[in-house]
C-alpha cells in the first residue's frame, strides 16, 4: 500500500523531509505547497524555495499561494484525496477548512510544548539547553498546539552551533516523518501540557547585539546566531571564532585580559571569552590580534 501525501514546507529543513518522502517506496507525494518565490541578496534576485526546486526536479505539481485561503487551494488539495498532509516549516497557519481534509502532521524542531513558534532551534541554543529534539504532532487551528504523536530527543554538545544542530534535527525529522505516517494507526495522540508551553519569536538582526556583560549569554548567542545575524557590538564590530573560557569570574566589561597567538581573551562583567576573529563595521575580516595591534590596544584596554 502507498500512502498518498500532500506536502507543505519551504526551507532546507523541509526540503530534506520531502526528499525522504520521495525516496520512500511506500509514499506517494502528489502535490507540494510552498511559499512564493522571494527576492534574495543585495541584488534582490527572485529565488524559489528549496522545496519548490526539489519538487520540480521530481515532476511534482507545486502551488505557491500567499495564503491558503486563496480561491482554488482547498479544492486542489481535496481533489488529490490524500491520506495525510505533512507540514514542515511551511510558514503559514493552516485554516480549519484544510485541517478537515485529512490528518495534518507537523514536524516541529523542538520537544513540544517547549518552543512553539518560529525559531525553536535557536531558542534551545540561546537558553543553553542540554537537550532538544523533534516532535511530530497533529495540527489544529493554534500555533504548534496540537496533540503530540512521536518524539526523538537529542543531547546537545556544549560547543555545537546552529548549523550542526539543524543538520542533526533535520536527519531526525526525516526518520520521524516516516515512522509517524507508518505507525499512525497505532499511535495514541498525547495532549500538550499547557503549563509547560513556551513561545519563540522570529529572530531579528538586533538580537545579535552583545555588551560584554555575561560571557555565557554571549557564547550562546554566538552558537544560536551562526550565519545570521551573528554577534556584534553596538558600534557594528562583528565577532567570530568565539570560545567560552569561564562563566564565574568578574572583570571589567570588554577588558583585554591577554593575547593567545592570534586570539584575544576578553573579560566580561561575568566570565571571559576567547575571540579569534573581528570585523569592524564596513571593514575586512581580521584576526583579533591584528585588530588590536592596528589600533594600539594592549592588555587592560577595552576591546572596542
From Swiss-Prot:
A Pfam match: Formyl_trans_N
Keyword terms, alphabetized: Protein biosynthesis, Transferase
Single GO MF annotation: methionyl-tRNA formyltransferase activity
E.C. no: 2.1.2.9
Residues given in the record as (6S)-5,6,7,8-tetrahydrofolate binding sites: 110-113
Top-level EC class: transferase
Database matches in Gene3D superfamilies: 3.40.50.12230
InterPro entries, alphabetized: Fmt, Formyl_trans_C, Formyl_transf_N, Formyl_transf_N_sf, Formyl_transferase-like_C_sf, Met-tRNA-FMT_C, Met-tRNA-FMT_N
Family membership noted in the UniProt record: Belongs to the Fmt family.
PANTHER family membership: METHIONYL-TRNA FORMYLTRANSFERASE, METHIONYL-TRNA FORMYLTRANSFERASE, MITOCHONDRIAL
Name of this protein: Methionyl-tRNA formyltransferase
Taxonomic lineage from the root: Bacteria, Pseudomonadati, Campylobacterota, Epsilonproteobacteria, Campylobacterales
Protein's gene: fmt
